[in-house]
Amino acid sequence: MNLIQQLEAEAIAEFKAKKEIPDFRAGDTVRVGVRVVEGERTRVQAYEGVCIARSNRGLGSNFTVRKISFGEGVERVFPLYSPNIDSITVVRRGVVRRAKLYYLRGRTGKSARIAERKVTKA
């Protein structure tokens, strides 16, 4: 392991000690608590939508969340280890057979629905 990989691994371990990141993947509906600065105040804004992509690249990992806001599709890319992310919660798990769900961009209504994955406890 070279020096950069070692520093990234330490930074990720330090971040995971402070915050818990749930196990989620594309197709899952997630609620992301984002810290928003308004003047001198900071507040947490919830952004809920379907995770359509996840990129695992060490400290540069990110995920894309898509939601429909007032009839318009809105996508937002979140860095996974960003200090501006307050919390990530999985609302429901979805059944998909792709790692990237970019095809949802062209779909609306019932065709854009994702079936729920039943979680069985072993």
From Swiss-Prot:
GO terms for cellular component: cytosolic large ribosomal subunit. It comes from the Bacteria. GO terms for molecular function: structural constituent of ribosome. NCBIfam families: rplS_bact. HAMAP family: Ribosomal_bL19 (MF_00402). Belongs to the bacterial ribosomal protein bL19 family. This is Large ribosomal subunit protein bL19. It comes from Novosphingobium aromaticivorans (strain ATCC 700278 / DSM 12444 / CCUG 56034 / CIP 105152 / NBRC 16084 / F199). The lineage of its organism: Bacteria, Pseudomonadati, Pseudomonadota, Alphaproteobacteria, Sphingomonadales. The gene is rplS.
